[in-house]
């Protein structure tokens, strides 16, 4: 079965960009980060034993997808014709995709994350990320709160204040999803976050864990599949920041909203 058919069967779409969760116009860096994010969710080392076979299959397919979109010639053919060269060396099914992945991405620790959080919160980078997320998601606070790094539900008033000030200063447009968000939606988001925090605390107590980095890591690994995926998604974003190529320089400037 060809790569496109496999993607349709396993991920529900034959669109390689959709498989990685990125736009067709995505830059090389965005494609790389998209691959990192989705591959972390199915990395065989991060799932339970009974899920390893399915995760390994998905992981291998994702590696092949990235191999196409990271190769200029193959990407050009796919963009123009919607086909992939199944005989290319990069799509060899016997390739060690785990070794390939580890060559691309540096592993970081939870200590790295904690150190990053201390410098990130309140920084110019966080400010730009919040405004960018606001533009990307057209003011949808559910998605903004999920996408900005190191954010907890208790940060929402601070995040809203940053966005409101940016709207008032005409830096960003006033999307109705933000300025007219219902209290019902706000309360639902708060309840979800509180339930998740309660679930984490219960899991910690059930495992007899004290608070701390090593125990937090053990707790993350013990959580339910959906929460594991969300944490992996967070780690993917963190690792993407730590793994930026040095020549890539600074983050691209905040996009201006087109009229």
Curated annotation (Swiss-Prot):
InterPro entries per record: DnaJ_domain (IPR001623), DnaJ_domain_CS (IPR018253), HTH_DNAJC9 (IPR056453), J_dom_sf (IPR036869), J_domain-containing_protein (IPR052594)
Record's subcellular location: Nucleus; Cytoplasm; Cell membrane
Residue positions where Phosphoserine is found in the record: 109
GO molecular function: heat shock protein binding; histone binding; protein-folding chaperone binding
Domain J: 15-82
UniProt xrefs under CDD domains: DnaJ
First-listed, main subcellular location of the protein, grouped into a coarse class: nucleus
One GO term describing the cellular component: nucleoplasm
UniProt-listed GO biological process terms: nucleosome assembly
Keyword Phosphoprotein appears in the UniProt entry: yes
Claim: Transcription regulation is one of the keywords in the record: no
Function: Acts as a dual histone chaperone and heat shock co-chaperone. As a histone chaperone, forms a co-chaperone complex with MCM2 and histone H3-H4 heterodimers; and may thereby assist MCM2 in histone H3-H4 heterodimer recognition and facilitate the assembly of histones into nucleosomes. May also act as a histone co-chaperone together with TONSL. May recruit histone chaperones ASF1A, NASP and SPT2 to histone H3-H4 heterodimers. Also plays a role as co-chaperone of the HSP70 family of molecular chaperone proteins, such as HSPA1A, HSPA1B and HSPA8.
Recorded domain comment: The functional J domain is required for the release from histone-dependent chromatin-binding.
Subunit text: Forms a co-chaperone complex with MCM2 and histone H3.3-H4 dimers. Within the complex, interacts (via C-terminus) with MCM2 (via N-terminus); the interaction is histone-dependent. Within the complex, interacts (via C-terminus) with histone H3.3-H4 heterodimers; the interaction is direct. Interacts with histones H4, H3.3, H3.2 and H3.1, but not with CENPA or the testis-specific histone H3.1t. Interacts (via J domain) with HSPA1A, HSPA1B and HSPA8. May interact with TONSL; the interaction seems to be histone-dependent.
Protein name: DnaJ homolog subfamily C member 9
Record organism: Mus musculus (Mouse)
Gene (name only): Dnajc9
